[in-house]
Amino acid sequence: MKTSLRLLAAVATLSAACATTSAQGPKTAVKPQDLAGTWSSPTCESIGNNNYIQRHFTLTENTWTLNLVAFGDAQCQAKLFTARIQGPYTLVKDSEAVPGATEGNFGFGELYMTPHMQPLADAFQNAKCGSGTWKVGEEQRTTETGCLFFRPTSACGTDHDLVKVEGNQLFFGQRPADNDMCAPEKRPAALTALPVVKR
C-alpha cells in the first residue's frame, strides 16, 4: 500500500504535463494544429521507486485530455489506477527559456479516477475522493474533491507549462518536485526528457 501511495505522489508530478492560455499568435513556434492528434508514451515509463506509467493524450486545437495509467510492473501489465484529466488549453507565446518551445496554459476542467485494484479503491474511499462508493474498474468524478495527491480544480485550475514538437514527438515542461505549476511564475524552464509520440 505504501508503494501505491508513493506511486500516486510520483504520478501526480507528471499528471498534468498540461495547462490554459489565450489566442495563438502567428509568431509562436508551436501552433494548435501542431498539437492536434493522439500522443502516447512510446514505452513503459519509469518514474522511480519501481513505479511506472503510460501517458495517452488527445488534443484538438483548443482542448486536451490525458489518460494517465499507473502500473506496478516494468512491463506495464499490472494496472494500479487511471487518472483522466481534461479541459481547455491555449498557447501564449514562445518560451524565452527554451528555444523552440511555446508557453501553454492547460486548464483542469474535469478530473476522474479509476482504481484497478482493491487496495487503491479502499485508499480512494478513505481519502474521501469523489462522492460515491469506490469499486475496482469503475471511474468516478473527483473534480471538486481531488484525490490524494491530485488537487481539486478549485485549488489549481491551470497548469502553466511548456510544449515543443520535434517531428512526431511532443515534449512538455519538466514538472517541479512539488508539482506546483498553478501560477505563471511556476512555469518550467526546461523540457521533460520523456516525450509522447504521435499515433
What are these regions (language model features)?
Residues 33-41, 63, 99-104, 143-148, ...:
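Short, hydrophobic/aromatic-rich segments at coil-to-beta transitions
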Residues 38, 46-131:
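N-terminal glycine/threonine-rich, aromatic-flanked beta-hairpin/loop signature
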Residues 81-98, 137-199:
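Edge beta-strand at a domain terminus
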